[in-house]
């Protein structure tokens, strides 16, 4: 692996609290997706790759659903110590560097909420597409942190927290709105024969009453609270995003309250695309 200075920029430091946050976020999203990796028949994959494996939660789900597949989880940080299915392997790497895999190596490639954090993430996507085998599936999920702050006049702490997060991402050429570009980027690839993108307009507050959206809203609200309000942040994030402890505490106080007089939404994008044969 490269030296720490060459790692991909990321606001959060790998801690037990971060692993718990990622597990909870995965579990909430998995419930929303009906515990399916994708809403299509993925066949009988033999090799599965997850890029940006974090706590390993998605890789564990994939390994259990496809016990005959070899699941490779990759990330710039090691997986936390936890029980893993026997068909999971881990490899430490930096996604900004050339992949050490031949083109077409994997029947399924998955990446969630990673491209938005990368400098010029749109340049990384074609290299990821290359890794998918002909007829295989690319599963990309990402987010758009909306700049629509009109509903936050009565929640200045929430506004400052999300503003700081967006500023810190933009400071290293990441794209907090990457999700809204995903469909166009995928459709522009001649290597894909089928592109499907599901856009989810998700209110963080007030919590939606819809049976599916309500639990997902609560999941993501808690995930954002634990991320922006984390005790340990990348120092660069604090400096460039202005996420001081005072800003964090105001964010946590309002996100943890039950006031209904403010509103904010994010857009989530879930995609499944098939590689041309």
UniProtKB/Swiss-Prot annotation:
The structure of strobilurin A was used for the development of the major class of beta-methoxyacrylate agricultural fungicides since its beta-methoxyacrylate toxophore targets the Qo site of complex III of the mitochondrial electron transport chain and prevents adenosine triphosphate synthesis. Compounds such as azoxystrobin (Syngenta) and Kresoxim methyl (BASF) are among the most widely used fungicides worldwide. This class of antifungals are used as effective treatments against a broad range of destructive fungal plant pathogens and make significant contributions to food security. Pathway: Mycotoxin biosynthesis. GO terms for biological process: methylation. Its EC number is 2.1.1.-. GO terms for molecular function: methyltransferase activity. Coiled coil: none annotated. InterPro entries: SAM-dependent_MTases_sf. Keywords: Methyltransferase, Transferase. Induction: Induced in strobilurin-producing conditions (on CGC medium after 6 days of growth). Gene3D superfamilies: Vaccinia Virus protein VP39. It is an enzyme of class 2 (transferase). Methyltransferase; part of the gene cluster that mediates the biosynthesis of strobilurin A, an antifungal polyketide that contains a key beta-methoxyacrylate toxophore that targets the complex III of the mitochondrial electron transport chain. Strobilurin biosynthesis begins with construction of benzoyl CoA by step-wise elimination of ammonia from phenylalanine by the phenylalanine ammonia-lyase str11, oxygenation by str8 and retro-Claisen reaction to form benzoic acid, which is activated to its CoA thiolester benzoyl CoA by the dedicated CoA ligase str10. Belongs to the methyltransferase superfamily. LaeA methyltransferase family. This is Methyltransferase str3.
